[in-house]
């Protein structure tokens, strides 16, 4: 995959807003020192790495129910 697009990631995440949240959380983990879950031989930025991980199905999410007020 030479270029990552939102459409590549939306195959794994149904909602683009959820995709933004998932990618941003993964970027924070990478900045804090987490190892990439994909091969990163190039000098890719953490945002690109996180999107590639999501598109490859290496990063997922679980929705929890909201608390009632």
From Swiss-Prot:
Keywords: DNA-directed RNA polymerase, Nucleotidyltransferase, Transcription, Transferase. GO terms for biological process: DNA-templated transcription initiation. It comes from the Bacteria. GO terms for molecular function: bacterial-type RNA polymerase core enzyme binding; DNA binding; DNA-directed RNA polymerase activity. One of its GO terms (cellular component) is cytosolic DNA-directed RNA polymerase complex. It is an enzyme of class 2 (transferase). It catalyses: RNA(n) + a ribonucleoside 5'-triphosphate = RNA(n+1) + diphosphate. Its EC number is 2.7.7.6. The RNAP catalytic core consists of 2 alpha, 1 beta, 1 beta' and 1 omega subunit. When a sigma factor is associated with the core the holoenzyme is formed, which can initiate transcription. Belongs to the RNA polymerase subunit omega family. Promotes RNA polymerase assembly. Latches the N- and C-terminal regions of the beta' subunit thereby facilitating its interaction with the beta and alpha subunits. This is DNA-directed RNA polymerase subunit omega. The lineage of its organism: Bacteria, Pseudomonadati, Thermodesulfobacteriota, Desulfuromonadia, Geobacterales.
